[in-house]
Amino acid sequence: MSEQQELQPAFSIEKIYVKDISLEVPNAPQVFLEQAQPEIDMQLASAGQQLDDGFFEVTLTVTVTAKLPEKTMFLCEVAQAGIFQIRNIPGEDLDPILGVACPNILFPYARETVSSVVNRAGFPPVLLAPINFEALYMQQRAQQAEAGNA
């Protein structure tokens, strides 16, 4: 490889995998007799870490809880992770890649895993809406800036 090619910005997906998965159905089997529609709550968390020179792991954790007024139907948590090769990217551009681009890649995998696991537990599949990770990232940055000025 020429020196110029080695200095070109590079981004590639090395591996996508499920790092952790859990499902709890604390009120089975009675919960399967319920007729009411549950309230679905979804929480997201994303974290990135450098593994090696130019290699980063990003983990997107999706937690979905289905609740009835007085009991939990299920709690499903999926930690979908990926190893990404990111080279020759300026420092100020690295954070948005780890906080926006990588979660955008991981979310469809996490969404499918949640739906499949919930369905295998005997519930209708949960269809999670797409997430605007750029808007979430900008919101977090604004909150951090506000907290820094307080």
From Swiss-Prot:
Keyword entries, A-Z: Chaperone, Cytoplasm, Protein transport, Translocation, Transport
Where found?
Answer: Cytoplasm
Superkingdom of this entry's organism? Bacteria
InterPro entries per record: SecB, SecB-like_sf
**What GO molecular function annotations does the UniProt record carry, in alphabetical order?**
unfolded protein binding
GO BP of this protein: protein folding; protein tetramerization; protein transport
Provide the primary localization. Answer: cytoplasm
Cellular component annotations (GO), alphabetically ordered: cytoplasm
The protein's matches in Pfam families, at most eight in alphabetical order, are given as: SecB
Q: State what this protein does.
A: One of the proteins required for the normal export of preproteins out of the cell cytoplasm. It is a molecular chaperone that binds to a subset of precursor proteins, maintaining them in a translocation-competent state. It also specifically binds to its receptor SecA.
The text of the family note is:
Belongs to the SecB family.
Subunit composition and interactions: Homotetramer, a dimer of dimers. One homotetramer interacts with 1 SecA dimer.
Protein name listed in UniProt: Protein-export protein SecB
